[in-house]
């Protein structure tokens, strides 16, 4: 009950670390409520620093683990978000070089199957390889972000 904070139905364990042998973090339910996408790593938080971190997904109606192999690589996959219609997943990955986190996007069909991820397009494609900074937690947005360049620049002024 969202008004009282009381649990009204039976509570089930969706992820058991003793059985799975790792930790789950950043659980996010799809907009249609069908799926739970999360990051699994060997231990604790900050999975972005764990090369074995992968994205996993559970179908909530029957608690079946879905195939997420299309999303994962031999290196880190971590922070993620759903598009508002649930047809896309945006996530961070170190699959290109194992050092820098970059954003990938993959389609999701109505049955929870993922398409092949691709590097998030940039106006200048070289930005994906020349940018020597990591992306942190990616989020989809639905509209233009209007920023005053002077105000944003002043946030990074060092006195």
What do the PLM-derived regions correspond to, one by one?
Residues 1-159:
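Sequence signature of WD/YWTD-type beta-propeller architectures
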